[in-house]
Structures are given as C-alpha cells and as structure tokens.
A protein has these predicted regions:
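Active-site glycine-rich loop that binds ribose-phosphate moieties when present
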Residues: 160-169
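Domain-level signal for Mg2+-assisted phosphodiester chemistry and nucleotide/NA-binding surfaces
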Residues: 2-139, 150-155, 162
Length: 171
C-alpha cells in the first residue's frame, strides 16, 4: 500500500535504464545561435564548429545513455547568381562566405561517427523583398523608395524538404 502524499506509483517510469538517444539539430538555427553565443567575431573555423556540434550533441546524451545518432538538418547553399535591385551588383550565392562555410561544416560533419547529414534545398521564389522595418518606414512616409540601400532588400528563399526528412527520421 502506498503512503499518502507519496509521488511514487506502480506505473512510474524507471529512468535508470540506459537508452539510445537520437539528437536532432536544426542546422540553420543552431549556427545562428552558436555564432551569437560562441563565435561573435566569426573567428572559428568550420572544423571547430563541426567539432563543437559533435561535442554539444554528445553532452546532451548523458553518461548513463548511449548515442544512437546525431541528425543534422540544413539546406544546401543556394547556387544562383542574382542582381540586387538597388545596387545592381551581381550576387553569386555559392561564393558567399556563408555558403562556403556551410559546405565546409557539412564536409567535416560527414567525417564524424554517428552523424547523419540531412540536407534539403532552398526554393527560389524569383523575387526580392523589402525588409519589414523598411516597409513600415515607407508606409509611414518617413522614407521614400530612393532612400533604400542594398541591405534593405533580400532575396526570398524558402527551405524545402527538411520537415519531411525530420518526419521520416522520427517515424
């Protein structure tokens, strides 16, 4: 018979049994957050970031459990040339420092044991958007279109097939 006020029940889970753990990482979010916390000057190499991803994932498994696999989800960098509508400069997305860095991280992660790299793609909408803060200023007539700079617009890209890959891995 159980004492009154006791939190234990017959059906309570036994958490002392080691379990296999899968760690799922949203690469895009992780890298943004990682840079804001540990790499503000962006001085770390892709190899160091990949090592940190691996180490952090292992630290979340705990000593009493086993790592089944680290699933790292991200998109292949966009590989198209477009012209900024404000500055008319040609942007070669595949040669941007961010794209090169991401590809290097992917290569280092591929070399790690128990890491599954799940890559989606970026869907090209074919158009540029004005940043919301600038749209607000335009609508309130604080600025005019001619006041926009090349940094006030961005090329619209949407992540595709990542959600499906997560669903398949969870099932």
């Amino acid at each position: 018979m159980e004492k009154k006020g006791s939190n234990k029940t017959e059906n309570s889970a036994n958490f002392n049994i080691p379990v296999k753990i899968a760690v799922l990482i949203d690469g895009g979010f992780f890298i943004k957050r990682y840079n804001s916390l540990f790499n503000k000057e962006k001085s770390k190499t892709a190899e160091e970031v990949a090592d940190d991803i691996y180490t952090l994932a292992h630290s979340h498994v705990g000593k009493e459990n086993y790592l089944y696999r680290i699933f790292f989800y991200d998109c292949i960098p966009f590989e198209k040339r477009v012209h900024n509508p404000i500055s008319k400069k040609c942007i070669v997305f595949e040669k941007t420092p961010e794209a090169i860095f991401r590809n290097q991280i992917f290569e280092f992660l591929k070399q790690k044991r128990k890491v599954a790299l799940r890559l989606g793609y970026l869907k090209d909408s074919g158009h540029w958007l004005i940043r919301p803060s600038k749209v607000k200023e335009l609508l309130s007539k604080n600025i005019v279109i001619d006041d926009l700079s090349e940094d006030d617009v961005y090329y619209d890209l949407r992540q595709k097939s990542i959600d499906m890959k997560i669903g398949v891995d969870i099932a």
